[in-house]
Amino acid sequence: VGRAGKGLAYMFTMMKTARLNVGIEGHAVAERAYQNALAYAKERVQGRDEADGSDDVAIIRHPDVRRMLLIQKATLAAQRALYLRAAALTDFAAACPDNVLRKEAERELDFLIPIVKAWPTDNGVVLTNLAVQIYGGAGYVEESGVAQYLRDVRITPIYEGTNGIQAADL
């Protein structure tokens, strides 16, 4: 299974990968909720256009809906960049023959992993909740599917080390 006395080091290597994966999971659920909310906002007709006063406009034309969608889109793009950096560092550290460069990548990765786990999972809950809000009352019922995304993403800040407690790793 490994060398004697190295179990804790092996476990933390596994935890890095697990935390990276959970961060990606939090992001992925929020991304799916965003995609659904965007499609819904384009087809759901309600109210009038504030700019020209026309009736029966898609809710994506309403400023508050646009604000929520833009928050989701921008946050998801930033999260994606962060976890892709962590994934690239993981691969680099595993394959780099230069000991100095490998250790440098491992140090950066050690710093990033708690962030990669906590930020996309905490915000995954927030962003998915925005998707429910965009759906309005329909978002609360099972038929929309978005209520399930909220339940699915809610566990991600908790498992593989609760975000508040693992923040001590920073």
Segments predicted by a language model, with ranges:
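Internal glycine-rich alpha/beta core junctions
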Residues: 1-170
